[in-house]
């Protein structure tokens, strides 16, 4: 079937024309529309069809394709159903090549080899896997070639010559050239420097055809791009037209749009019998066009993986962002002046944060001696300021004037806005609309500090969606923008970078505890776990001190036996999400779950890869605390120690108290109080009527009997 792709481009070249490639998301606008739209494409004169495999978190795509994915998933489309649509289209006479385009996690969840075999049987010709890194592509391509199909690599304006050389070896039918940095979507004009990009790519791809996409929507665009490329890809425009078309008219809309692009030109297509004969022969005699490299190793100063977890599972355009960031980070941490600059800010932060015993909490829990590491006393009220200031220093070293950040509870947003105000950089914070509602105080704090807050209305309107939007913005505005990721999540180098800057928490804890306990180590350290910034910061300095138990407490929401929780390590499975392989809350089709937590800062369906590694090796243990249990932790610390903790930290307080009960009175554990709780007072007031009775806590005002 890869041979059919090669023949398609060869025929177009022989006929002195460009191959037209059109895109549609499977199951959009409805499931029953998909096959008619594909037939409309073919009848209009399309050479190749890209069929999008719906995914819950398509970070490389703009609003149009995002919407089509969301609608398709709401329509119940799964990966097996997508393959069934391909099979149905073939049986109804669609014989032009069909390429399945999508993201890696649903394929990984399905099983790569089984998925490729099933796709070949259904009648697919190949795949574009948007976020598949080259080192993984080498393995996957072998499965694909064994089944006679093709893996089409994506290259971007930012793709290095080294990567171009590798990707040209991967290509056995054609290469998809992303014409501009950013996400998919209609543009008013084609990229002005396209000639130069195509020329650079051809140095490595030689005679392999190049198809160019991103922003093409008119016949004029088609002709302009076609003057330098072999094929032209159109996606968002036709998705919009079909979505807007009335029911029963979508075949006609697809056909007429393609005819307009091609000015009515047609080409010969295979009959149904010819196609099935071609498919049968292809499956029997799969062959590889050219040799492929066995391995691909880019140089990295710091390992990009933690065991099986980590990596850089991102769209090709994002590699430029990560490469620049990694180089800047490597140089900074090797430069003593960077650390001098950072440590000179300790007095501004309020470091070292205090460590002290919680006498009354210890007495209440009746077990180990409980200590509190008071990150809530930092400037801005949480541990987030450590990472935010360090990354803003890094942004200045890289010459960036604009800083963006994502935030859930708002603590990271406030910390980043604070750092930007101190150093004179502009700050834009992406925040889910639901989090904007429940964390109004922090939103106003950010605005007071001069930051612009963008409420993200996609998806669940929480941290996950804010993170996706921040990545999309970054790749479009790399030249001037630095992205301060707030947790130990995302592609390399972010997990290493955030852990490095937050490890001051664990280092101080170790030193302070030893100074007060004759050089001893604590027996356990406890932290809440969302993405992992405070937990990796607390745990990493103790990683090799195996006598110290590491306990992470996740957000159990309504309970891990329900759908309403954020306990990724407790209830998730390995997958790929936001550019990294880690534990992910996902359904049976590999779609990322909606999450729930009373705490906005823990409301995230992934987790840092280092935490995933520690779980897999047994070095750290993880439990989940429900919303009610977290509220109990909130109450205990408030009323026994006079410290109102953040709801995030309240999970750790509850988990630590339960752990302390199993320990001896001469043992010691430390809780990382990652943030203060003034931001959560309104949230607690909202949930108390529901959760208060579960823990025996009623704060309602009694009526004055004398009134």
Curated annotation (Swiss-Prot):
The active site is at residues 50, 61. One of its GO terms (cellular component) is cytoplasm. The keyword Phosphoprotein applies. The modification N6-(pyridoxal phosphate)lysine is found at residue 384. The modification Phosphoserine is found at residues 540, 683. CDD domains: Trp-synth_B, Tryptophan_synthase_alpha. This is Tryptophan synthase. The gene is TRP5.
């Amino acid at each position: 079937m890869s041979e059919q792709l090669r023949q398609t481009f060869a025929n177009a070249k022989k006929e002195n024309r460009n191959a037209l490639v059109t895109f549609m998301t499977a199951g959009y606008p409805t499931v029953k529309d998909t096959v008619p739209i594909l037939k409309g494409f073919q009848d209009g004169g399309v050479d190749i069809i890209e069929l999008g495999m719906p995914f819950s978190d398509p970070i490389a795509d703009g609003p149009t394709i995002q919407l089509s994915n969301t609608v398709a998933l709401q329509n119940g489309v799964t990966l097996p159903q997508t393959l069934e649509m391909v099979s149905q289209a073939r049986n109804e006479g669609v014989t032009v090549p069909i390429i399945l385009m999508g993201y890696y996690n649903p394929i990984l969840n399905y099983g790569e080899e089984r998925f490729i075999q099933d796709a070949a049987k259904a009648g697919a010709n190949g795949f574009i896997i948007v976020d598949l890194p080259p080192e993984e592509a080498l393995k996957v391509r072998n499965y694909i070639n064994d089944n006679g199909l093709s893996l089409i690599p994506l290259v971007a304006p930012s793709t290095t010559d080294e990567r171009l050389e590798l990707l040209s070896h991967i290509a056995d039918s054609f290469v998809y050239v992303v014409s501009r940095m950013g996400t998919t979507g209609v543009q008013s004009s084609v990229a002005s420097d396209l000639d130069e990009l195509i020329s650079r790519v051809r140095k490595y791809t030689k005679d392999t055809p190049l198809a160019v996409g991103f922003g093409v929507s008119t016949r004029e665009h088609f002709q302009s791009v076609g003057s330098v490329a072999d094929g032209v890809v159109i996606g968002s425009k036709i998705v919009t037209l079909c979505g807007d078309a009335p029911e029963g008219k979508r075949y006609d809309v697809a056909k007429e749009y393609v005819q307009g692009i091609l000015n009515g030109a047609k080409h010969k297509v295979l009959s149904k019998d010819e196609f099935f004969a071609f498919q049968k022969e292809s499956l029997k005699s799969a062959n590889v066009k050219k040799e492929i490299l066995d391995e691909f190793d880019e140089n990295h100063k710091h390992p990009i993986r933690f065991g099986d977890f980590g990596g850089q599972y991102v769209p090709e355009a994002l590699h430029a962002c990560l490469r620049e960031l990694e180089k800047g980070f490597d140089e900074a941490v090797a430069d003593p002046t960077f650390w001098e600059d950072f440590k000179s800010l300790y007095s501004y932060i309020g470091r070292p944060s205090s460590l002290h015993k919680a006498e009354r909490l210890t007495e209440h829990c009746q077990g180990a001696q409980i200590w509190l590491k008071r990150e809530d006393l930092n400037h801005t009220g949480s541990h987030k300021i450590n990472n935010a200031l360090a990354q803003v220093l890094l942004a200045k070293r890289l010459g960036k004037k604009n800083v963006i950040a994502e935030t859930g509870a708002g603590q990271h947003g406030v910390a980043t806005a604070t750092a930007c105000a101190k150093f004179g950089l502009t700050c834009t914070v992406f925040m889910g609309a639901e989090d904007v509602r429940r964390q109004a105080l922090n939103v106003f704090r950010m605005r007071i500090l001069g930051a612009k807050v963008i409420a993200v209305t996609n998806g669940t309107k929480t941290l996950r969606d804010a993170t996706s939007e921040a990545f999309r913005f970054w790749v479009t505005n790399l030249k001037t923008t630095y992205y301060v990721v707030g947790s130990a999540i995302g592609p390399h180098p972010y997990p290493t970078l955030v852990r490095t800057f937050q490890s001051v928490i664990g280092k101080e804890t170790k030193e302070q505890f030893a100074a007060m306990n004759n050089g001893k180590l604590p027996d356990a350290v406890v932290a809440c776990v969302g993405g992992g910034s405070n937990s990796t910061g607390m745990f990493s300095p103790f990683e090799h001190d195996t006598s110290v138990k590491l306990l992470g407490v996740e957000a159990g929401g309504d309970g891990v036996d329900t759908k309403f929780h954020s306990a990724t390590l407790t209830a998730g499975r390995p997958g790929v999400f936001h550019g990294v392989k880690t534990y992910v809350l996902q359904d049976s089709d590999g779609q990322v779950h909606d999450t729930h937590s009373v705490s906005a800062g823990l409301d995230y369906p992934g987790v840092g890869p280092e935490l995933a590694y520690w779980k897999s090796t047994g070095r750290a243990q993880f439990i989940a605390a429900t919303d009610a249990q977290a509220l109990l932790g909130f109450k205990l610390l408030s009323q026994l120690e006079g410290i109102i903790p953040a709801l995030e930290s309240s999970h750790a307080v509850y988990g630590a108290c339960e752990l302390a009960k199993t320990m001896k009175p001469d043992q010691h554990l430390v809780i990382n109080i990652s943030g203060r709780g003034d931001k959560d007072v309104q949230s607690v007031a909202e949930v108390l009527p529901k959760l208060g009775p579960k823990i025996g806590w009623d704060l309602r005002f009694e009526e004055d009997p004398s009134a």
